[in-house]
């Protein structure tokens, strides 16, 4: 009787160990975290651990077939097109560049083979490359681009909300609001 109980006990322990170590085909354990919906308030959150709320931004239209440069800051700049976006520990900035003109639609951030759509958060001394997020452009006019953005990297970098960027074109030797 003791042998039967010992074998039963060992069998149960063995099954428990095998069950605990086995893998599952449940997709929910492997799926990536889905991104939240866009906030309907002004783009805000944390950059480099500092509270951040969007104030001024621009997209620079290249004078030739170069790249479109995007800059967003929490600084209240007097002129989105001609001001300097420096980025500092108290006012980090967001920068990005794309080879295509802004157009209505949505894109996910990525950094993998064949895909390099990223944002850079800059705090005056360090560039943080952000590869998780999404950007949705709602409207593009001669003078502005409106949209929504969600971007995250760890607990110190997360923003979500809406933005309006000035479209800036070269006018002589300076940039000014586009007037096509």
Predicted segments, located by residue:
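Sec-dependent bacterial lipoprotein signal peptides
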Residues: 1-20
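Bacterial Sec-dependent N-terminal signal peptides
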Residues: 15-42, 173-174, 179-180
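Sequence contexts marking disulfide-bonded cysteines in secreted/extracellular proteins
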Residues: 22, 80-82, 109-116, 167-170, ...
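Edge beta-strand at a domain terminus
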Residues: 28, 148-180
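Tryptophan-anchored aromatic micro-motifs
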Residues: 36-58, 116-124
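Short, hydrophobic/aromatic-rich segments at coil-to-beta transitions
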Residues: 38-39, 66-70, 141-148
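Surface-exposed helix/loop patches within compact recognition domains
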Residues: 58-139
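Extended, loop-rich substrate-binding clefts of extracytoplasmic carbohydrate-active enzymes
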Residues: 129-154, 158-160
């Amino acid at each position: 009787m003791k042998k039967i109980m010992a074998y039963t006990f060992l069998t149960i322990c063995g099954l428990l160990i095998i069950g605990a170590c086995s893998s599952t085909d449940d997709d929910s354990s492997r799926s990536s975290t889905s991104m939240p919906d866009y906030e309907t308030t002004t783009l805000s959150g944390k950059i480099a651990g500092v509270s951040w709320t969007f104030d001024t931004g621009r997209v620079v239209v290249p004078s030739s077939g170069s790249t479109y440069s995007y800059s967003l800051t929490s600084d209240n700049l007097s002129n989105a097109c001609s001001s300097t976006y420096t980025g500092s520990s108290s006012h980090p900035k967001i920068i990005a560049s794309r080879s295509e003109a802004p157009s209505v639609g949505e894109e996910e951030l990525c950094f993998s083979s064949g895909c390099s759509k990223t944002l850079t958060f800059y705090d005056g001394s360090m560039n943080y490359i952000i590869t998780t997020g999404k950007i949705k452009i709602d409207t593009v006019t001669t003078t502005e681009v409106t949209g929504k953005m969600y971007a995250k990297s760890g607990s110190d970098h997360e923003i979500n909300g809406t933005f309006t960027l000035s479209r800036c074109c070269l006018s002589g030797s300076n940039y000014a609001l586009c007037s096509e």
